[in-house]
């Protein structure tokens, strides 16, 4: 088993409020991988508030270059530099976002002291997040349906088959150094024979995924990409009475989010990117609306934490 921790650093939209800052989501897993989805203004303050060092981030995935999703990147990189970061950082985003980041660094003449690997996500794609383990994390992306080029992301964990002690006993095999080789390579030489993970596992490979739409209006491409997600973090800027306005601005309503959660087969829907016009208790309108279609829905708030054991 493994554990995934999701922390909502900022749950708001274009206009921040005292209670909802610009969008940003931190995802950490049991292998030590740390991914930051979007980096709104003030993200490094939010990281400090939850006790996470910016230098622990391995991958920064930016959906698009609108200010509420990207304005925190420059300060974040500079803080990493001041913390003497040395390990490389991967940034995945659209070409416009990467150009914005590069030009900002050039304008400030910052010498970061660590390598920044830019991944230009022009079309759909996949990135392996590298840490040595039998389990694996990959990040997938697809173009969203916003008013500028934007991305939706999906974090997919592939869990290797788990070794069953009862099968080891039945095969008269004793645990030893060969177990590590087996986990890393899928097979090992043991007492004159080749043993595979399949031979000593009660179940096969499993997958678990967390999808994040970024800013998007409902469309077939995004719905298809979200299919099979276990947790769905979905744009829910407005309620359904403002569906026309949401569509014109390239956003979704809470009802749109619920419908996508239902068709995707998700187990949990998290409403995200909430407009500042819903202050305090008024935001519950979004939750009430979504739950009529998809009951297992929660409304995100700044500082919200979710831990999942898979």
UniProtKB/Swiss-Prot annotation:
GO MF annotation, one: zinc ion binding
Keywords per UniProt: Endonuclease, Hydrolase, Metal-binding, Nuclease, tRNA processing, Zinc
Enzyme class, UniProt record, top EC level: hydrolase
Pfam families: Lactamase_B (PF00753)
CC cofactor note: Binds 2 Zn(2+) ions.
Family: Belongs to the RNase Z family.
Protein name as catalogued: Ribonuclease Z
């Amino acid at each position: 088993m493994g554990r995934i921790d999701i922390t909502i650093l900022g749950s708001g939209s274009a206009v921040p409020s005292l209670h909802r800052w610009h969008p940003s989501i931190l995802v950490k897993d049991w292998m030590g991988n740390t991914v930051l989805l979007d980096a709104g203004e003030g993200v490094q303050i939010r990281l400090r508030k939850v006790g996470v060092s910016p230098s622990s981030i391995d991958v920064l995935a930016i959906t698009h270059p609108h200010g509420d999703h990207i304005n925190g990147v420059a300060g974040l990189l500079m803080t990493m530099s001041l913390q003497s970061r040395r390990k490389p950082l991967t940034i995945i985003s659209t070409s416009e976002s990467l150009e914005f980041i590069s030009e900002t660094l050039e304008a400030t003449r910052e010498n970061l002291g660590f390598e920044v690997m830019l991944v230009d996500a022009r079309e759909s794609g996949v990135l392996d997040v590298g840490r040595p383990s039998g389990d694996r994390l990959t990040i997938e992306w697809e173009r969203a349906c916003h008013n500028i080029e934007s991305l939706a992301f999906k974090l997919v964990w592939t869990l290797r088959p788990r070794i069953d002690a009862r099968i080891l006993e039945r095969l008269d095999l004793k645990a030893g150094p060969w177990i590590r080789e087996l986990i890393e390579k899928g097979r090992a030489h043991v007492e004159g024979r080749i043993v595979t993970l399949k031979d000593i596992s009660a179940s096969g490979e499993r997958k678990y995924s967390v999808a994040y739409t970024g800013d998007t209006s409902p469309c077939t491409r995004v719905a298809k990409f979200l299919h099979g997600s276990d947790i769905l973090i979905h744009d829910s800027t407005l309620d359904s009475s403002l569906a026309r306005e949401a569509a014109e601005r390239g956003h979704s309503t809470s009802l749109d989010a619920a419908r996508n959660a239902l068709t995707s087969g998700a187990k949990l829907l998290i409403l995200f990117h909430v407009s500042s016009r819903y202050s305090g208790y008024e935001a519950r309108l979004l939750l009430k609306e979504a739950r009529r279609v998809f009951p297992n829905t929660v409304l995100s708030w700044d500082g919200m934490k979710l831990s999942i054991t898979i």
